[in-house]
Amino acid sequence: MTTAAADNPGLPHTRSQAHHLTGFWLVTGAVVILQAFATLPTPLWPLYAQRDGLSSTLVTVAFAAIVVGTVAGLTFFGHLSDRLGRRRIIVPALFVGIVAAVVMMTWPAYPGLLAGRFLTGLAVGVVASTATTYLSDLYRAARPSSSTRFPSTVASIAILGGLSLGPLVSGALAQWFTAPLITPYLVFIVAMAVGIVAVLVSPETVERRAFHKERAPRFRLRAGQRLAFIGASAVAFCSFGGFGVLLSLGSLIVQNELHVTAPFIWGLASFVALGVSAISQVALGALSPRWMLGLGTGAVAAGFLVIIIGLFNPSMTLFLIGAAIGGAGLGLLFKSALAVAVPAADPASRAGVIARFYTTAYIGQGLPPVLLAFATSFVS
């Protein structure tokens, strides 16, 4: 065992390293669960619209309420893990996610949707930057000689892969189980409780520091990295903007324009787009950020063109093909942006820098869909 570790320094050769590697995958699982919860309502929006008599604009605003919470979480809490520790931030965030599920399950009115989505965003915002940094810490401790790109890739896949699972799981539960607006939340309450346990048994990677001691600035980049970070944030904005349109309006489009009545199918386009986005990062993640940016841009343009064709000549098949192509492109755009943003951060303020990066990305997820919904309602 010792010889194998010596021959391959990438293998964890101490109990501590093994513990950190186990924690790496446990925290990854917790991130996937919370991200999946964030997109849980995607196939349920038509049901909410029917129950509460909501227009597509009000549905989009309810969807975008998550962005307000996310930005608040990133702005006010996203940097705190650099000082308080990673687990001390992620565990309360998962508790907030459970509260959000309870609110959306037990408050059957539009204000309940808004409150639940805001709390969901608060949890997602806190975890987004903290978990990305936490995964990097854990993997570096487990495999000091390995590439730093791997944890960044895993974090990106966990975020987008988790987002893809939400519509699939909730759509299946709504389709084949009773109480479609309650059962999915019960399942995810249990899942998030499991996520809390997973984080609690993972090792902490930051020593808690008192607030009166000298502290690192919330946001500080390495020398010469400002333009690179700004560019990466802009790309993340565009990537999440595309996902936001699919997540907020995709189910209503499938129901109203393609005349599909099954909740499972309502969430399928979002699952395909986000799932393929995660797969594309695995398949092409070794490319340079420049290549990923170019390929991603082309795929997004092609994908949305196919979606438009599928709407003008109603075809669920074309819609799904377009969602897959566009999703692959959006995933590559996000991966290229994250690959530039992470190394641009000063080591002492990584969580704060990544919080700023995700703030821009999540604003992109909410703002374009809301503007599109208002523009559509104005034209119609």
Model-derived features: where do they sit?
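Transmembrane alpha-helices of Major Facilitator/SLC transporters
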Residues: 265-289, 299, 303
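C-terminal transmembrane helical hairpin of 12-TM major facilitator-type secondary transporters
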Residues: 291-337
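A late C-terminal transmembrane helix in Major Facilitator Superfamily
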Residues: 338-379
